[in-house]
Structures are given as structure tokens and as C-alpha cells.
């Protein structure tokens, strides 16, 4: 595993101890191997190992784990989001966006909509569609604030929105 040292305490949480969202790339990154190993050892959630494989860039391994997990829990939104993330990690950005749009149609008006919009924004950003990323992150932030979401989620959306706006401004 690759570990980033120092200066990551301000990075948004990625949902698994030892992994945080890099505020430049807006992608999850391992920041502490020991904390991550402890979290994985204590976890019974198959999604945690899938997330790790995605962070490591092992899309094929993540897809295999995901197929098994989806068989056991076909309706899990988190696992369906990971399906699109497998596509993103495989550099199939258009297809990842398409899957996220389908999930967005299903989650519109629910508490999960903000999470889907946040992930959609990351796929847009990774694929170079920064304008669409700004829109998606802004909507995710608005929904999270309006819904009194956890402060860590609001922070993650704010960081992503600011980064996307900065990149958009640099390229204008």
C-alpha cells in the first residue's frame, strides 16, 4: 500500500479510517496504513475491501468482490455506487457518469441524492468535465446543508466544489 505522510488531517474523510479524499485530485487516497489495516481487520462490510481495491487502482479485483457482494445485497446503494466507481477507476468516465445518472434518477428527492451527486461530480472531474463537476458538487453541497447532513459530508462537498471551481477558473 502507498501511504501519504503528513498534511492530510484537513483532507475530507473517505468513509474508511486510513483513507481520505485528496483535495487536489478529489480521489480517495491511503493516508495511514496502520489505521486502515485495523479498520479492515475489524470490518465485516465487504464494501470496505472494495473501496480499498478501488483506491489502490485494482478495478478488476474490486469488480470481482463487488459481484459477490451485489449477489448477497443487490439493492445496496453503496455497492451500486461502487459499480460506477469501478468504471471510473477503469477510465471509462462516460459510462461511470451514465451509471451515476441512472442512480440519480432513482434517488432524486431522497436523502441519498446528495451522495450520488457527489460521486457523479467526482466522475465528471476525473473525466475532465469540470463545469459539470461544479454543478454536481454545488447541488450535493446544497442538499447536504439543507438536510443538516453530517459536518464531514458537508465539508467534503465544500472542498470538492472549491477545487472544481479553482480548476474551472484556471482554464477560463
Enumerate the predicted regions with their spans:
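Structural signature of alpha-solenoid helical repeat junctions
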Residues: 41, 75, 112, 152-156
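TPR/TPR-like (Sel1-like) alpha-helical repeat modules
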Residues: 130-148, 155, 159-162
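Sensory/regulatory domains in signal-transduction proteins
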Residues: 116-119, 136, 153
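Inward-facing hydrophobic residues that define packing positions of alpha-helical scaffold repeats
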Residues: 59, 66-67, 100, 137, ...
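N-terminal alpha-helical interaction modules that lie
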Residues: 1-73, 89, 167-172
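Alpha-helical junction/boundary sensor with strong preference for TPR arrays
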Residues: 73, 107-108, 144-147, 168
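Alpha-helical adaptor scaffolds
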Residues: 47-56, 67-115, 119, 129
Amino acid at each position: 500500500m502507498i501511504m501519504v505522510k503528513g498534511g492530510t488531517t484537513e483532507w475530507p474523510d473517505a468513509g474508511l479510517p486510513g483513507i481520505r479524499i485528496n483535495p487536489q485530485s478529489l480521489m480517495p487516497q491511503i493516508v495511514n496504513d496502520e489505521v486502515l489495516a485495523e479498520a479492515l481487520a475489524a470490518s465485516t462490510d465487504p464494501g470496505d475491501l472494495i473501496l480499498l481495491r478501488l483506491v489502490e487502482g485494482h478495478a478488476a479485483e474490486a469488480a470481482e468482490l463487488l459481484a459477490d457482494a451485489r449477489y448477497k445485497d443487490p439493492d445496496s446503494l453503496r455497492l451500486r455506487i461502487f459499480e460506477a466507481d469501478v468504471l471510473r477507476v477503469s477510465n471509462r468516465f462516460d459510462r461511470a457518469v451514465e451509471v451515476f445518472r441512472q442512480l440519480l434518477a432513482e434517488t432524486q428527492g431522497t436523502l441519498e441524492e446528495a451522495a450520488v451527486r457527489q460521486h457523479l461530480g467526482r466522475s465528471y472531474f476525473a473525466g475532465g468535465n469540470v463545469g459539470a463537476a461544479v454543478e454536481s458538487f454545488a447541488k450535493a453541497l446544497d442538499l447536504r446543508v439543507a438536510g443538516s447532513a453530517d459536518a464531514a459530508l458537508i465539508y467534503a462537498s465544500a472542498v470538492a466544489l472549491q477545487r472544481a471551481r479553482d480548476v474551472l477558473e484556471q482554464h477560463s
